[in-house]
Amino acid sequence: MEFDTIAAISTALGEGAIAIVRVSGDDAVEKVNRIFKGKDLTEVPSHTIHYGHIVDLDTNQVIEEVMVSIMRAPRTFTRENIVEINCHGGLVSVNKVLQLILAQGVRLAEPGEFTKRAFLNGRIDLSQAEAVMDLIRAKTDRAMNVAINQMEGRLSKLIGRLRQDILETLAHVEVNIDYPEYDDVEEMTHNILIEKATHVRSEIAKILETSKQGKILREGIATAIIGRPNVGKSSLLNSLVQEKKAIVTDIAGTTRDVIEEYVNVRGVPLKLIDTAGIRETEDVVERIGVERSKEMMSQADLVLVVVNYSEALTNEDEELFRAVQGKDFIVIVNKTDLPQAIDMERVIELAAGNRVITTSLIEEQGIDELEKAIADLFFEGTIDSADVTYVSNARHIGLLTQAGKTIGDAIEAIENGVPIDMVQIDLTRTWEILGEITGDTVHESLIDQLFSQFCLGK
């Protein structure tokens, strides 16, 4: 497959030590060589790096001092010739270098176009391409490991084996239908077909079992911190983040809006949401914050309910407990450095079997226990991203669910005595759905939509 030559800045825009302009295409080396003063890049070996200068051909002025990496097809990310120009970081010089390259007849790359070419040229499949963006967006080491495993093809191999099993079954069915007179062909009975289809459904179910944890590792746990004003919600946020993101004062109602922050808790990414203290108030701005707090609480995957150890439970406290019933929540009884006024037995009763943890955030006590409780709640205390192939992408989860239902329909049809040639339809559809995960059976419009979500230069 032949494409034109493209270029883009591959590093984040802004001031920094180094910025990289990436060029990919059959004539990438020749195009860059025109504006490079140093060695003749067309003569140098592949996978080498060379010092020189970028020159404006119109003025013969040196624009940048650079190091240029030459990587020749097919041993490159896109399977095309790739040139990477390492410039000094900054906006002006790197943009000037890019403009000089574009002036040589090179096109500015679209978002994700380098990765798209890697997919279209057969270097990676679609699930591996999506893992590239997951790696970029990873919030924890665990999420990074899951993305790397997918980039290395773990999920692709699982899907490939399932599709091969289905294909062999379909071929067996086809032979039985077209050549029933052949004595050396094993008869495809309903029992054999049920056994093979049940195996596929079981394998799909095993992969889907990892989806909840996989999605958490990829997207994080939306965690709302709720409680009455001045019980220590912002202090809890700051303790988990380990830096002062929220204003902490003795004045009730200081947090009037929703503060969001990602934090790594024992490999689990939490999207922490510090909400405005929930109480009845006449302050218009604070009241808006309270309403937003209630909305965020309803949308959260996990709720941290904070109450004050040094104060008796109020009707507002009890109302919060009622509001979180049916959700995953942990109760934090804060300010244990002060004299006790709260009824702990009542707190435990309201917690209804959920964890209750006592803390003194001002003395940094109880945070380790809270972090362990969060990991226990979602991962039973352990996250084994090394040996488990997690499925974390919502598109993949949806397709696997759809494939599981379709193969289930096939099994039901077999059990009801539907002719084998009719069962072929559901088996073929299952094979096609699984192929959409890896991109073997996917529409071009979906490919364009997926890669448009990538950053420019990737």
From Swiss-Prot:
Pfam families: MMR_HSR1 (PF01926), MnmE_helical (PF12631), TrmE_N (PF10396). It is an enzyme of class 3 (hydrolase). One of its GO terms (cellular component) is cytosol. K(+) binds at N230, T249, I251, T254. The keyword Magnesium applies. Homodimer. Heterotetramer of two MnmE and two MnmG subunits. Exhibits a very high intrinsic GTPase hydrolysis rate. Involved in the addition of a carboxymethylaminomethyl (cmnm) group at the wobble position (U34) of certain tRNAs, forming tRNA-cmnm(5)s(2)U34. Belongs to the TRAFAC class TrmE-Era-EngA-EngB-Septin-like GTPase superfamily. TrmE GTPase family. This is tRNA modification GTPase MnmE.
